[in-house]
Amino acid sequence: MLMAELPEPPTPTLSAIYASYEARQGDGFRDHLGASLIGKSCTRALWYDFRWATPARHTGRILRLFETGQLEEARLVRDLRATSATVLEVDPDTGRQFRVEAHGGHFGGSLDGVAVGLLEDPKTWHVVEFKTHSAKSFAELVGKGVALAKPQHAAQMQIYMHLTGITRALYVAVCKDTDALHIERVPADPETGERLLEKARRIIFAQHPPERISSDPAWFECRFCDHHGLCHGEDAAAITCRSCLHSTPVEGGWHCARHDRLLDPADQRRACPRHLFIPDLVPGEVTDAGDDFVAYRMRDGSPWTNDAREEEAAAC
């Protein structure tokens, strides 16, 4: 029997290029719940994101693809300015990207820019959002429009409009395969903006994870989720202050009840020896608990104790 021809292995140089991207990707945790994510259909996945249950990790090829999208933004700004539009990529008052925040700084995002002088409506300021698409995704976008084809992108723009008070958004999409452009003007919908803000509030301040979108681990949204192994399997959550039952989001940061102190982002990433998992993150049933331990009966019937009763170490 003839064997299928195996692909050539990557060259050392190619492997090194991808490895350099992977080395620079950080720890996979975002300090806030992002406006770019709030349109996700699974609220449990968003809660896991916010609680740093699973670090987001990507291959070098995917990270390079993300960078391509970022590099495209400068070209799209140039294209808009060629039409005589005024495009601001940074806030003149701060010299930084325009940024919106809500819920004590736990929710927010950064705008790609704002624009005025557009040919369709020269006097109205617009939130500007740039996105790159595969050929298949681009065709669906052109056929259905952003609200139906890319609800997560639409939600992101609604949040930006709602929190800036700008009444229009300009969605500029480029097909990575053909360089074709698609442009839509999107009106602000205050009701949708408020609903999305409330969704973010529920996720941020929820003590327990919301229901998963599907109990079927093979459901398409579940199969490609960063949290699949934790939500549907036996994977352990990452050990950070955010996965600890002692921590709570408060105005402007996080508070640890065990040590009665505020936690900066570096603290949150380090955790401490008194860390105890939020029980919802453990695949088992609580059988006993105390100040510094929680005992479980795991799904396979075995006992396990999340024990922090060792000699006190430095506060987290």
Predicted feature locations:
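Internal, hydrophobic cores of structured domains that mediate oligomerization or house catalytic pockets
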Residues: 123-127, 131, 152, 161
